[in-house]
Swiss-Prot record:
Sites bearing Phosphoserine, chain numbering: 2
Pfam families hit by this protein: Heme_oxygenase
This protein's name: Heme oxygenase 2
Keywords: Acetylation, Endoplasmic reticulum, Heme, Iron, Membrane, Metal-binding, Microsome, Oxidoreductase, Phosphoprotein, Repeat, S-nitrosylation, Transmembrane, Transmembrane helix
Enzyme Commission no: 1.14.14.18
Composition bias type Polar residues, residue spans: 1-15
Species classification: Eukaryota, Metazoa, Chordata, Craniata, Vertebrata
Gene name, Swiss-Prot/TrEMBL: Hmox2
PTM sites of type N-acetylserine: 2
Segments traversing the membrane: 295-315
Repeat positions for HRM: 263-268, 280-285
Length: 315
């Protein structure tokens, strides 16, 4: 009789034990959450190392830009949640439908009212680059709803991961009320434990009955989401290259026509304070930027992207 213990199938017990860890590892790597994590790592790393993201982490963000970021987030989540509602019974998405716990549109409306007042809808619109992402979300929801998983996971899991950190950065940098006005977006009232909910959500996602080909398409879609967001940065770069020319062409009274230019901290620091014509005051440039609707929308979408990237950073 052989010294090796055999199973009823005639398979060596030691062989079974040796292959068990391999099977477990293979199963884990086939999980959609793992595929997404690994499949988007490169895009994520590129995005989180941009100067804009680093500055935001340091609290280098102005209130006007944060207001515009809230605007871009409003349009993004309005599109996403509209398509999620449309597909709440679709078998490839239904297990991930948690409107009470996750939906952000109503919270964003409160933030919009805080920043812009009751007539906020008359004051805002979506930028060109952000609109492309919104259009993609609508296309996916209406034609390939299984790919909504990529957008929902990327947004909501990131928000749960980095939301509280982002909220504190914004409140400190912008001196927003500690009671939550202006940062309702980051408050998940119906999620008691973010870490546990994320684990639950990933388990639901991994249990979806999807082919490997569909999982790969979902990973590809998540990378597209990063790509759309990076296009917003490209849009910002183009706007920056046009900034000096547009400011000179349009003109703007120094300090919006108020006060003496000699009291400007930038001007006061110049060695030759006797000539006004040669001073290029950054405050004047900043005012010009904030008065240009096209640049406002671009900056809004860019700051919105940072929120998403920072959220991924803390996942």
């Amino acid at each position: 009789m052989s010294s090796e213990v055999e199973t009823s199938e005639g398979v060596d017990e030691s062989e079974n034990n040796s292959t068990a860890p391999e099977k477990e590892n293979h199963t884990k790597m086939a999980d959609l959450s793992e595929l997404l994590k690994e499949g988007t790592k490169e895009a994520h790393d590129r995005a989180e190392n941009t100067q804009f993201v680093k500055d935001f982490l340091k609290g280098n963000i102005k209130k006007e830009l944060f207001k515009l970021a809230t605007t871009a987030l409003y349009f993004t989540y309005s599109a996403l949640e509209e398509e999620m509602d449309r597909n709440k019974d679709h078998p490839a998405f239904a297990p991930l439908y948690f409107p009470t716990e996750l939906h952000r549109k109503e919270a964003l409306i409160k933030d919009m009212e805080y920043f812009f007042g009751e007539n906020w809808e008359e004051q805002v619109k979506c930028s060109e680059a952000a609109q492309k992402y919104v259009d993609r979300i609508h296309y996916v929801g209406q034609n390939e709803p299984e790919l909504l998983v990529a957008h929902a996971y990327t947004r909501y899991m990131g928000d749960l991961s980095g939301g509280q950190v982002l909220k504190k950065v914004a409140q400190r940098a912008l001196k927003l009320p500690s009671t939550g006005e202006g940062t309702q977006f980051y408050l998940f009232e119906h999620v008691d434990n973010a870490q546990q909910f994320k684990q639950f959500y990933r388990a639901r996602m991994n249990a979806l009955d999807l082919s490997m080909k569909t999982k790969e398409r979902i990973v590809e879609e998540a990378n597209k989401a990063f790509e759309y967001n990076m296009q917003i940065f490209s849009e910002l770069d183009q706007a920056g290259s046009m900034l000096t020319k547009e400011t000179l062409e349009d003109g703007l009274p120094v300090h919006d026509g108020k006060g003496d230019v000699r009291k400007c901290p930038f001007y006061a620091a110049q060695p030759d304070k006797g000539t006004l014509g040669g001073s290029n005051c950054p405050f004047r440039t900043a005012m010009a930027v904030l008065r240009k609707p096209s640049l406002q929308l671009i900056l809004a979408a860019s700051v919105a992207l940072v929120a998403g990237l920072l959220a991924w950073y803390y996942m």
